[in-house]
């Protein structure tokens, strides 16, 4: 599978806002997400990160403006066609009680044949490939509930890979994991993007993890985009203070010199 051309975009937003009665959660914003890259949505709690991600995944319709996928309004896509392009993983994962890893990953094939379609050889090949890519093929017959936190998250990501979508939307994929499993999952996401040309848009809380594993960052505060760009452009004390509202500084990492943030 060839990576997408780097000048393409997956999602673009034109003066998009989102409101609930009595409150505007996202103020009008315009931006485009680069295709084939890992993009991190960062910012304080309540800044609008998850709301924006849910709008991209068509879980929230925009109050105003237009969200486009590949230059086409998201409302114009059928459910099946949209699912063949975009896969969404919520922060609160659905129950997988009694399901094996293979059974969970196979759910990703649903957009390609539907509830009454036959699960064929091509579907099995996609499932096997997805499990192999995330390192879970030896666990195919294990119950999902018996896996560690990192393994369970990899199983859900394998389901998205089996869906064969070009864009993955991940809402805080590392929030319930310890540091070792956070690194494991983010390294996997980065590798999948680079090897398969996938666009990944993920809500992330840890700015240092986001800077290490993302190609592009979009920072929100109070429902507004206040900074965006490569991690090197965001990892400055004054920019981080503007994003998080507290004094922050930057030190070079002793191995490689990559910028690492800290709180005063």
Place the predicted regions along the sequence by residue.
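Conserved ABC ATPase "signature" region
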Residues: 106, 121-139
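Helix-to-loop junction immediately C-terminal to a conserved catalytic motif
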Residues: 57
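The feature captures the beta-strand-to-loop junction immediately N-terminal to the Walker
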Residues: 42-44
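Conserved ABC ATPase signature
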Residues: 118, 143-147, 151
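Conserved ABC transporter NBD signature motif
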Residues: 65-73, 82
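Catalytic Walker B motif of ABC-type/P-loop ATPase nucleotide-binding domains
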Residues: 168-172
């Amino acid at each position: 599978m060839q990576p997408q051309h780097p000048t393409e975009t997956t999602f673009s937003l034109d003066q998009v806002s989102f409101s609930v009665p009595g409150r505007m959660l996202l103020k009008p914003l315009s931006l485009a997400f680069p295709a084939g890259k890992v993009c991190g949505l960062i910012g304080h709690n309540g800044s609008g990160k998850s709301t924006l991600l849910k709008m991209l995944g068509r879980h929230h319709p925009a109050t105003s403006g237009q969200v486009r996928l590949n230059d086409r309004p998201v409302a114009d896509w059928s459910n099946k066609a949209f699912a063949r392009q975009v896969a969404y993983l919520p922060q609160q994962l659905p129950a997988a009680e009694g399901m094996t890893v293979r059974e969970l990953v196979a759910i990703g094939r649903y957009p390609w044949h539907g509830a009454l379609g036959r699960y064929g050889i091509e579907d099995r090949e996609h499932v096997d490939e997805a499990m192999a890519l995330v390192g879970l093929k030896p666990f195919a017959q294990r119950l999902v509930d018996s896996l560690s936190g990192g393994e369970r998250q990899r199983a859900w990501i394998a389901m998205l890979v089996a869906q064969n979508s070009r864009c993955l939307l991940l809402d805080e994929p590392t929030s319930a994991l310890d540091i070792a499993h956070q690194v494991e999952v983010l390294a996997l996401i980065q590798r999948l993007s680079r090897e398969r040309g996938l666009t990944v848009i993920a809500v992330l809380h840890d700015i240092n993890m986001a800077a290490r594993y993302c190609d592009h960052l979009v920072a929100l505060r109070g429902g507004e985009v206040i900074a965006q760009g490569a991690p090197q452009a965001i990892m400055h004390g004054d920019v981080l203070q503007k994003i998080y509202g507290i004094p922050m500084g930057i030190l070079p990492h002793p191995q490689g010199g990559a910028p690492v943030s800290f709180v005063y």
